[in-house]
Amino acid sequence: MSALVYFSSSSENTHRFMQRLGLPATRIPLNERERIQVDEPYILVVPSYGGGMAGAVPRQVIRFLNDEHNRARIRGVIASGNRNFGDAWGCAGDVIAQKCGVPWLYRFELMGTQRDIDNVRKGVNEFWQQLSRSA
């Protein structure tokens, strides 16, 4: 299996989801001055912020993806959000999928449920298997 990369704000909702998921993952730093580079294909797990499509993707994630090295390795995106955002629920996944030309694989609310954890575990495994067969 390849990597998961995620960002979690100070609310730690996405971080708690990733801990429960129990798969190897790299966290995009909260501090905007810290940078990371990912050297293998990865699925990005990202929260969505309110304010519509324009403000949905966290700045740290934008900075991470603006690095061509990182952008070249993204293979899919999973988004979290809050259903209170209505149509914009989880829309960071849609924005990133469109801009990076990758599939939007799943969306979950806040910290996710056990069903979300199970679905993501299974889906991530199947996604990497399918991708490796088509390579």
UniProtKB/Swiss-Prot annotation:
Write the gene name: nrdI
Family that this chain belongs to: Belongs to the NrdI family.
Entry function: Probably involved in ribonucleotide reductase function.
Q: Which GO terms fall under molecular function for this chain's record?
A: FMN binding
Q: Which organism is it from?
A: Salmonella gallinarum (strain 287/91 / NCTC 13346)
Identify the Pfam families for this entry.
Answer: Flavodoxin_NdrI
Q: Name one GO biological process term.
A: protein modification process
**Family annotation (SUPFAM superfamilies):** Flavoproteins
| Protein name in the entry | Protein NrdI
